[in-house]
Amino acid sequence: GHDWGDQYIRRTGQCLRDNTPAGTVCARLSGDEFLVLFHGYRSRDAVREKIDCLTKAMQQSVALLPSGNALHISLSGGIAWYPDDGQDWETLKKYADFAMYQVKHSEKGRVEEFDIGVYNREAYAERTRREFRQLLSNAQVFYCFQPIFSARSGRVVAYEALMRSDLPTLRSPATIMKLAREQGALYEIERLTFTKALETFDSLCRAGSVSGDAMLFVNSIANTCLSHEDGKYINSHWHELCRRMVVEITEEEEIDYEALERKRNAPGFSGMFALDDYGSGYSNENTLLQLAPRFVKVDITIIRGIDTSPDKQQILRNMVAYAHPRSMKIVAEGVETAAELRTVIELGADLLQGYFLARPAIVPGAIAPEAAGIIQELQRRKKD
């Protein structure tokens, strides 16, 4: 009870007083937290020696329980050094406190020195978590759109919606997804993705800033399904867009195919899937068979340098040979050079996406003139 707790704290205070040199300041801050100020020493090692002696003495000290049994006193502590860690009282106290709580959250019964690197990482991580909560509460994301072009005509046939955030620690979608998994917020991100992407793209359509009949590719979390109510809400607000929406799936974990079927049968959904990052090591043949996607997006690792790699060329050739008889279209994703563009078209890719053609933008632009010229040139050769 409280009396026993007070006795334990008094015994701890006595141990600190009895096992520190004269001139050492010992004070109780609150609860079971004490502060010890060592000063007047020539080196850190001299202080460390005193702290080591204090720790050993504390471990040998006992407090008697009401039952008569002895309980050894355990000490967890943190050290901050003047002037290297801080030059004022508040900073030193804050840093020593941080070091102590690092011990309490790992292996108790030790004394650790403050580490500015760990502190900065923890502070950054806490800021990131705080900004993630802010992102969810205020829907603080916006969308850029990257055009996807026909390999035959160079015409825009679709746009991929790409999530962005202005929050300083959440510029990367990968960071947002990592936090969503850690904090059990995948559903909230899935709902935010669909509502914001469709809302933004609808505004672009109304303004005439995008091709009016183009499809919209939206990245979805494989095993996360929107509720029936959220699905109905989305369909009622953006019914026409839902009929042109392609849901992109990346296999980053074992896929629940029942969840995919629920996605496929969502209210108003076109039923079109795209298998993203195919060939990256995540997406495999079983997923290709089970998902039966309308589009297969070939991973950038295969597209990069494909013009000089016979092995990569054979992989793409095999994928085209598998996809076309099954009414699947091959999307060459991450095309960044003229040589890559020529190669993927010659190997039979149906759709093209990448910086060489057009970069993602809030208001997406037209195909780059050089890329358009290459497509036209290759089509003329085919006709000839």
Which residues does each predicted region cover?
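C-di-GMP signaling machinery
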Residues: P83, F98, Q102-C144, R152, ...
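Alpha-helical scaffold within the catalytic cores of cyclic-nucleotide enzymes
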Residues: G13-R17, A46-S67, K94-Y95, T193-C205
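Catalytic core of bacterial c-di-GMP phosphodiesterases, primarily the EAL and HD-GYP domains
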Residues: V157, Y187-R262, G334
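Conserved long alpha-helical elements within nucleotide-processing catalytic cores of c-di-GMP signaling
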Residues: G1-D18, A27-G31, L35-V36, D45-D52, ...
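Catalytic strand-loop-helix junctions within cyclic-nucleotide turnover domains
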Residues: L37-V47, L65-A70, S74-L92, G117-R121, ...
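EAL-family c-di-GMP phosphodiesterase catalytic domain
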Residues: A151-R155, S165-T169, S209, N219-C225, ...
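Catalytic core regions of nucleotide second-messenger enzymes
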Residues: A27-L29, M58-L75, K104, C205-G212
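Catalytic-core segments of nucleotide cyclases and related cyclic-nucleotide turnover enzymes
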Residues: H2, R48, S67, Y82-K108, ...
